């Protein structure tokens, strides 16, 4: 997925980046000189150290999320199980991008005999990235469905969303996404595969949007119905809406961070020879950075929106070698 490979090197997701190669001579020359009308130059270079650093940060943050959910029994609920699945997907996307940078660096510095082996490894990493992307989308959709049930089927929720069903759902998501991700990379040279991936992305977003339109339009009506019941129904419903708002933020960040990459794919198949499309595609590495930033931002959203998760984060950090930071923060 990372495009720091030499010109003319086409492997799996790398072949989806035509901004620096595979273009007609006149367009290539325009890029080489700098496309003055659009302010474009050759493929934007991002230091490999940036990819590796972001990968490490994402790894640490998302491991913290996974450990926190596993450690705190108060977080053993369907929503947090799906968040855990999303954290795994985010971690794999970001770490795989960082690892791929190392692989491509080795590819550029090794002999021709070793390149075929390195390309195979690169294809495996790309399969992980593609599978994790699909798992991220499916996990977000699962959280949306879970929030929908908590609001519209509050009284039957615990009978509908059992731990067993959640486990089966998560397992099915990862099995299907793994198979799909591998197939996408195997047939990545086909435009039909790219169209299919784009279609999956926008279809999932449309499904989530439709759930949210219905959810927020009807939320007040259901809050009024729950309010007449004995107990703390209103409080419970308010917590459910808070979870829905959290997911709205997650989806918004996901769209902002992933949309440029999918727009790149749309340009790749629709106008690969247009100078303006080439201009947009010349920033491919920047779009990869945005994708990795999504994996870093998500854990921060969890922490800001969940007091229980924030509390567990602090407990874990205080028990780690960084525990001295807790003493320092308590003094101020």
Swiss-Prot record:
Entry's transmembrane regions: 44-69, 82-106, 124-145, 166-186, 192-215, 249-271, 281-304
GO cellular component, one term: cytoplasm
Extracellular side: 1-43, 107-123, 187-191, 272-280
Disulfide linkage: 40-279, 271-277
InterPro entries: GPCR_Rhodpsn (IPR000276), GPCR_Rhodpsn_7TM (IPR017452), MC3-5R (IPR001908), Mcort_rcpt_4 (IPR000155), Melcrt_ACTH_rcpt (IPR001671)
Pfam families according to UniProt: 7tm_1
Glycosites: 2, 17, 26
Record's bilayer topology term: Multi-pass membrane protein
Segments on the Cytoplasmic side according to the record's topology features: 70-81, 146-165, 216-248, 305-332
Lineage: superkingdom: Eukaryota
Keywords on record: Calcium, Cell membrane, Disulfide bond, G-protein coupled receptor, Glycoprotein, Lipoprotein, Membrane, Metal-binding, Palmitate, Receptor, Transducer, Transmembrane, Transmembrane helix
SMART domains attached to this UniProt entry: 7TM_GPCR_Srsx
Residues binding Ca(2+), per UniProt: 100, 122, 126
Protein task: Hormone receptor that acts as a key component of the leptin-melanocortin pathway at the intersection of homeostatic maintenance of energetic state. Plays a role in regulating food intake: activation by a stimulating hormone such as anorexigenic alpha-melanocyte stimulating hormone (alpha-MSH) inhibits appetite, whereas binding to a natural antagonist like Agouti-related protein/AGRP promotes appetite. G-protein-coupled receptor that activates conventional Galphas signaling leading to induction of anorexogenic signaling in the hypothalamus to result in negative energy balance.
Assembly and binders: Homodimer; disulfide-linked, also forms higher order oligomers. Interacts with GNAS. Interacts with ATRNL1. Interacts with MGRN1; this interaction competes with GNAS-binding and thus inhibits agonist-induced cAMP production. Interacts with MRAP and MRAP2; these associated factors increase ligand-sensitivity and generation of cAMP.
Family label: Belongs to the G-protein coupled receptor 1 family.
Protein's name in the database: Melanocortin receptor 4
Originating species: Bos taurus (Bovine)
């Amino acid at each position: 997925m990372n495009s720091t490979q030499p010109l003319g090197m086409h492997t799996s997701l790398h072949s989806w980046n035509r901004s620096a190669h595979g273009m007609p001579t006149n367009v290539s020359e325009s890029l080489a000189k700098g496309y003055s009308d659009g302010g474009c130059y050759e493929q934007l270079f991002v230091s490999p150290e940036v990819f590796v650093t972001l990968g490490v940060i994402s790894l640490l943050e998302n491991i913290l999320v996974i450990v926190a959910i596993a450690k705190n029994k108060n977080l053993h609920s369907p929503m947090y199980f799906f968040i855990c699945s999303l954290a795994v997907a985010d971690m794999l996307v970001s770490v795989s991008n960082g690892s791929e940078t190392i692989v491509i660096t080795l590819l550029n510095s090794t002999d021709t005999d070793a390149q075929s082996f390195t390309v195979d490894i690169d294809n495996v990493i790309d399969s992980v990235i593609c599978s994790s992307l699909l798992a991220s989308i499916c996990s977000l959709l699962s959280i949306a469905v879970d929030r929908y049930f908590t609001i519209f089927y509050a009284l039957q929720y615990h009978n509908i969303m059992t731990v067993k069903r959640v486990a089966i759902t998560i397992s099915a998501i990862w099995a299907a996404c793994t198979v799909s991700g591998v197939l996408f990379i195997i047939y990545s040279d086909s435009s039909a595969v790219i169209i299919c991936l784009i279609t999956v992305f926008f279809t999932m977003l449309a499904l989530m949007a439709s759930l949210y339109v219905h959810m927020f339009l009807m939320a007040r009506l259901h809050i009024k119905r729950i309010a007449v019941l004995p107990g703390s129904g209103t409080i419970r419903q308010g917590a459910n809406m808070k979870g829905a708002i959290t997911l709205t933020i997650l989806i918004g960040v996901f769209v902002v961070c992933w949309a440029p990459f999918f727009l790149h794919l749309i340009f790749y198949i629709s106008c690969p020879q247009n100078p303006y499309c080439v201009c947009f595609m010349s920033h491919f590495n920047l779009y990869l950075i945005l994708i990795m930033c999504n994996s870093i931002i998500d854990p921060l959203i969890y922490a800001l929106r969940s007091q229980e998760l924030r509390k567990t984060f602090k407990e874990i950090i205080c028990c780690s070698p960084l525990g001295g930071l807790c003493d320092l923060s308590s003094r101020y």
